[in-house]
C-alpha cells in the first residue's frame, strides 16, 4: 500500500469517523422529550445558564452522550486485546462471558454487600469478569481450543450465570429494582458522576495498551519468536489481560453489560486493513464510540415517546448478525470445523434393561407428580400424611386438584415434549449439541408469542402457539441455512443458534420495555415457569396439539436410525432423506414452540434428557423416544417441585433450576468432545 492509499485510509477512518461521531453527538443531545433547538444547544455549550433547557442539556443529555463515547471506545479496545491474547477473532467481552460474570458479581454485591458496593463495585465487577474469562479459556481447551469452541463456551457460561443472576433478581426484587433496564445495558445518566468515575480509569488503561502496542505486535509472531527477540511474553499478556478486563469492568459498573461492540468495531478496522496494534486500538476506540452512540440514537428513534430501549438490546441486534456472519466466514477454514457431527455423545458400552428402565422411570415420574401435588410450597411432611390418612379439608382438595395437579401435569408434559424435540434435532442433524434453546427455537418462539401478545392483544390465548411456532420455525430455518455449509458442524450450529438466541432476546427486551410488561412477570416467563398454570393451559395449549404431534413423531422416529448412518447410506436404503428431515424438523419445531408458549423458554432440557437416555438404553430411537420423554417429564417436574419448596416463600422458576443443572452438563459435554478431537 503506497503513501496515498495510507493517507486516504487514514482520512476515511479517522477523518470520516470523527465527523460521523460529531454528527451523531449533536443528533444525540438533541433527542429527548424536551424540545431543545440546536441553536439553544450551541448556546448552552458556549455560555450555559440556570434555565431548565440548559440544565437538562448539561446535566442529562451531555453526560449520556459522553459516557456512550467512552463506553464504546473502551469496549472496542478491550475486544482488540482479547482477540489478540486468545488468537480468537470471535473473542469479546460478551462472547467470552466477561459481561455476565461482572454483572453476576455486581448483582450479588448489591444484594449481600450493599454498604461496600459504592466503594468496591469496580472491584466486584473486575473479579467477576476475570474469573469468568479464565474459566471460559480453560473449559474451551486453552491454546488447543478453536475460536468457535471458545465463543460457544463463553455463550453457555453466559446462559448459566444469567440463570443465577435471574434467580437472585427474582428473590430480591426490591433490592434489585431498576436493574432490569440497567442489566440490559443503559446509558441513562442523571449527572456527571459516571463520567467522572470512569474517565480516568478508561484513559489510563487505554494509554497502557497503547504503550505496549509494539509488544502486542510481536506476540502475533508466536511465543517462540517473541522470546527470541527478548520479549517477556508472560508479562505482556498479564498487563494486556488486566487492562482489557478492567476496561470492561469499568463499563459494566457504570452502564451495565453492553455486548458486541468489542466484536464489530475491531473487525471493521481489520477489514479496512489495520493490523498494527497502535493504529488498530486508536481506530477501534473511535469506531466503537461511533457504534455505541449510533445505537443509542437508533434506539431513541425507534421509540421517541420517551420509553427507554436498553442500548444493549440495540447493539445485540447489530452484533448478533455480525457474529453469525463471522462464523459463516470461518466455516471455510477446516481448522475451525474439526468437530464431526457424529451423534454418539452420551453413548455407553454398557446399557440397562429397557423394561426395567421404563418401569423405574414411570414409577419415579408418578412419585414426583404425587409429591408435587401433595407437598405445599413450604414442604411440610404433614401434607403427605394428611393425604395418606384422608384428613383433607375442602380447601386442601381444591388446592391439590385445581392448582397443583394441573401445574405438575403441565410441567411433566412440557418436559417430555421438549425432550422429544431435542432428541429429534440431535438425530436429524447428527449433532450432540442440538437443543431447542441452543439452536434458537426457544428465543424465536418467545419472540413469536410476544409479537402476538403485543400486536394483537385481543386475540384468544390459543393463538400464542401459532405465533410461537412461526417464530421458532423462522429461527431454526435461519440457523440451518447458515450452518448447512459446515455440514451442520456441532459447534458452528450451536454458535449460530446462540447468535440467533441473542438477537431474539434483544427483541424480547425491546418488547418488554415498549409494551410496559411487568418486569418480574416477564423475567419469570423468560426464565421458564409453570407458575399459575391450570387446566385451561393443559387442555387448550399443551395437551391436544402436543398429543397429536407426539404420536406423529413416534411413528416417524424410527427413520432416525437410518438417518444417523449418513445421507448416502440412507438414500441407498430407500429413505426419502430430505422429506423425512423436513417433516421431522417442522414437527419438532412445532412441538417445542407449543410448549414454550405455555411454560416459557426452558434451556438445556432438550439436551440433557436425550443424553441421559442414550447412556441408559443405547441408540435405538424408539427406545430413546420413550426414555427421553420420561426423563424430560421427571426433570421438569423435579425442577418445578424444587423451585416451589427450596426457597419458600420465594419461588424459583423451574427453567432456572434446569439451566443451573443443564449448563454445567453442556460444558462438560463440550469439554469431553473437545478432548476427543484434540
UniProtKB/Swiss-Prot annotation:
One of its GO terms (biological process) is siderophore-dependent iron import into cell. The chain crosses the membrane at residues 10-30, 65-85, 94-114, 116-136, 151-171, 192-212, 238-258, 278-298, 307-327, 357-377, 409-429, 438-458, 462-482, 493-513, 517-534, 537-557, 584-604, 623-643, 650-670. GO terms for cellular component: plasma membrane. It comes from the Bacteria. Disruption phenotype: A mutant lacking both fpuB and fatCD permeases is incapable of using petrobactin as an iron source and exhibits attenuated virulence in a murine model of inhalational anthrax infection. One of its GO terms (molecular function) is transmembrane transporter activity. It is a multi-pass membrane protein. CDD domains: TM_ABC_iron-siderophores_like. Keywords: Cell membrane, Ion transport, Iron, Iron transport, Membrane, Transmembrane, Transmembrane helix, Transport. Its main location: membrane. The keyword rRNA processing does not apply. It is found in: Cell membrane. Belongs to the binding-protein-dependent transport system permease family. FecCD subfamily. PANTHER family: FERRIC ENTEROBACTIN TRANSPORT SYSTEM PERMEASE PROTEIN (PTHR30472), FERRIC ENTEROBACTIN TRANSPORT SYSTEM PERMEASE PROTEIN FEPG (PTHR30472:SF24). Part of an ABC transporter complex involved in ferric-petrobactin uptake. Probably responsible for the translocation of the substrate across the membrane. The complex is composed of two ATP-binding proteins (FpuC or FpuD), two transmembrane proteins (FpuB) and a solute-binding protein (FpuA). This is Petrobactin import system permease protein FpuB. It comes from Bacillus anthracis.
Amino acid at each position: 500500500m503506497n503513501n496515498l492509499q495510507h493517507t486516504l485510509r487514514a482520512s476515511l477512518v479517522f477523518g470520516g469517523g470523527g465527523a460521523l461521531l460529531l454528527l451523531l453527538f449533536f443528533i444525540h443531545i438533541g433527542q429527548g422529550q424536551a424540545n431543545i433547538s440546536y441553536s439553544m444547544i450551541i448556546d448552552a455549550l458556549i455560555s450555559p445558564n440556570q434555565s431548565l433547557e440548559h440544565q437538562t442539556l448539561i446535566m442529562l443529555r451531555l453526560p449520556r452522550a459522553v459516557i456512550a463515547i467512552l463506553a464504546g471506545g473502551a469496549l472496542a479496545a478491550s475486544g482488540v486485546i482479547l482477540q489478540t491474547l486468545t488468537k480468537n477473532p470471535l473473542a469479546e467481552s460478551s462472547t467470552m462471558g466477561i459481561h455476565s460474570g461482572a454483572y453476576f458479581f455486581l448483582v450479588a454485591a448489591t444484594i449481600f454487600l450493599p454498604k461496600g458496593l459504592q466503594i468496591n463495585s469496580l472491584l466486584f465487577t473486575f473479579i467477576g469478569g476475570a474469573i469468568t474469562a479464565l474459566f471460559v479459556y480453560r473449559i474451551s481447551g486453552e491454546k488447543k481450543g478453536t475460536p468457535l469452541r471458545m465463543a460457544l463456551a463463553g455463550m453457555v457460561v453466559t446462559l448459566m450465570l444469567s440463570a443465577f443472576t435471574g434467580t437472585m433478581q427474582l428473590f430480591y426484587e426490591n433490592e434489585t429494582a431498576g436493574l432490569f433496564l440497567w442489566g440490559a445495558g443503559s446509558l441513562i445518566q442523571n449527572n456527571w458522576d459516571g463520567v467522572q468515575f470512569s474517565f480516568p480509569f478508561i484513559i489510563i488503561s487505554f494509554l497502557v495498551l497503547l504503550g505496549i502496542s509494539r509488544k502486542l505486535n510481536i506476540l502475533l509472531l508466536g511465543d517462540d519468536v517473541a522470546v527470541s527477540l527478548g520479549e517477556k511474553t508472560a508479562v505482556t499478556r498479564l498487563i494486556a489481560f488486566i487492562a482489557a478486563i478492567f476496561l470492561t469492568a469499568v463499563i459494566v459498573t457504570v452502564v451495565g453489560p453492553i455486548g458486541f461492540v468489542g466484536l464489530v468495531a475491531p473487525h471493521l478496522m481489520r477489514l479496512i486493513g489495520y493490523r498494527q496494534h497502535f493504529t488498530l486500538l486508536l481506530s477501534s476506540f473511535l469506531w466503537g464510540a461511533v457504534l455505541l452512540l449510533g445505537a443509542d440514537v437508533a434506539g431513541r428513534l425507534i421509540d421517541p415517546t420517551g420509553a427507554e430501549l436498553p442500548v444493549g438490546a440495540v447493539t445485540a441486534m447489530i452484533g448478533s448478525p455480525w457474529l453469525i456472519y463471522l462464523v459463516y466466514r470461518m466455516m471455510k477454514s477446516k481448522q475451525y470445523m474439526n468437530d464431526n457431527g457424529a451423534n454418539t455423545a452420551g453413548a455407553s458400552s454398557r446399557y440397562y434393561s429397557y423394561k426395567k428402565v421404563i418401569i423405574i422411570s414411570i414409577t419415579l415420574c408418578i412419585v414426583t407428580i404425587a409429591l408435587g401435588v401433595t407437598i405445599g410450597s413450604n414442604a411440610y411432611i404433614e401434607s403427605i400424611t394428611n393425604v395418606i390418612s384422608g384428613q383433607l379439608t375442602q380447601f386442601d382438595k381444591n388446592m391439590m386438584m385445581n392448582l397443583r395437579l394441573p401445574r405438575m401435569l403441565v410441567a411433566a408434559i412440557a418436559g417430555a415434549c421438549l425432550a422429544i424435540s431435542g432428541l429429534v434435532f440431535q438425530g436429524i442433524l447428527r449433532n450432540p449439541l442440538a437443543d431447542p434453546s441452543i439452536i434458537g427455537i426457544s428465543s424465536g418462539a418467545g419472540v413469536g408469542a410476544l409479537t402476538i401478545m403485543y400486536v394483537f392483544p385481543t386475540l384468544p390465548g390459543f393463538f400464542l402457539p401459532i405465533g410461537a411456532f412461526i417464530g421458532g420455525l423462522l429461527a431454526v430455518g435461519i440457523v440451518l441455512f447458515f450452518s448447512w455449509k459446515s455440514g451442520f458442524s456441532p459447534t458452528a450450529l450451536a454458535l449460530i443458534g446462540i447468535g440467533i438466541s441473542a438477537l431474539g432476546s434483544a427483541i424480547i427486551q425491546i418488547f418488554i420495555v415498549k409494551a410496559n410488561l411487568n418486569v418480574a412477570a416477564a423475567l419469570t416467563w423468560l426464565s421458564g415457569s409453570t407458575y399459575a398454570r391450570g387446566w385451561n393451559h393443559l387442555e387448550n395449549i399443551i395437551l391436544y396439539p402436543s398429543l397429536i404431534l407426539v404420536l406423529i413423531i413416534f411413528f416417524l422416529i424410527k427413520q432416525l436410525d437410518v438417518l444417523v448412518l449418513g445421507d448416502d447410506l440412507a438414500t441407498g436404503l430407500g429413505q426419502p432423506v430430505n422429506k423425512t428431515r423436513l417433516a421431522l424438523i417442522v414437527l419438532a419445531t412445532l412441538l417445542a414452540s407449543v410448549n414454550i408458549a405455555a411454560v416459557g423458554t426452558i434451556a438445556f432440557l432438550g439436551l440433557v434428557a436425550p443424553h441421559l437416555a442414550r447412556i441408559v438404553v443405547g441408540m435405538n430411537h424408539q427406545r430413546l423416544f420413550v426414555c427421553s420423554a420420561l426423563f424430560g417429564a421427571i426433570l421438569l417436574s423435579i425442577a418445578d417441585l424444587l423451585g416451589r419448596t427450596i426457597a419458600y416463600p420465594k419461588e424459583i422458576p423451574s427453567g432456572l433450576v434446569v439451566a443451573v443443572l443443564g449448563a454445567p452438563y453442556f460444558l462438560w459435554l463440550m469439554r469431553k468432545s473437545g478432548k476427543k478431537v484434540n
